[in-house]
C-alpha cells in the first residue's frame, strides 16, 4: 500500500486527510525506520508494508465506526511504536491518548515522535499495566482501552478492564479469529466486570483477515485485580 493508495483507501470511508496529516504519517514512517536501527520497534520497515500493516491496520477502529471524532480518552497498552493509538490520534486530533509501555527506550521514541508530529494531549507512562491498574489516578478513568497483538484475551483482559470507566470499551485488535481465545477468557471477562459485545471482522486491502473484539465494562472490577506484575501472564483467571 503506497502512501497514495493509503489516502485513496481512506476516502472510501469518507476520510480526507489534510496536508498536515499526510506529512505527519510521512514523518512517522521516517522516524520509525530511523529509530528501529537503534532499538527494536518493528519487524516491518518497508514503506508500503508500514502504511498497510501499521498505519491502515491501526485506524481500523475509526474506519469501522468504533471510535468517532470526539474528545474521548484512550489508553493504549503495550503500544510499542505507537500502534494503534497514534495513527488514530493523527486522524482524530481531539482524542486524548495515554500509552503505557514497560520499556523506557520505546517511551523515549514515543516522546520524540509525539513532539515531532506536534501531537498534543498524549501522555506517556513507563511501567507495567498491572501496576498502573492499581493506581487511583488511572484505574476506572478511560473511555476506551486499545491493545494490538499484546496477549491472549484471558491475560489481556486483566491488563485492560480495570482501567475502563463503567460502560467503557476494550478494543482488542487481533490478526486471527479468536473464538478459542474468547472461550478461554469467559471466566476472566466476567470476573473483571466485563461483557463480550461483538466481534468486527474485516480484511486489509491486501486480503489479510483482521478481527476486533469489543468488551464492555458493565461493573466495577474487584480491587484484587490486576494482580501483581507477571501474575496474569503466568496464571490467567480460569
Curated annotation (Swiss-Prot):
Sequence positions that bind S-adenosyl-L-methionine: 78, 83, 129-130, 148
InterPro entries attached to this UniProt entry: rRNA_ssu_MeTfrase_G, SAM-dependent_MTases_sf
Compartment(s): Cytoplasm
Root EC class: transferase
Keywords, comma-separated and alphabetical: Cytoplasm, Methyltransferase, rRNA processing, S-adenosyl-L-methionine, Transferase
Stated role: Specifically methylates the N7 position of a guanine in 16S rRNA.
Name assigned to this protein: Ribosomal RNA small subunit methyltransferase G
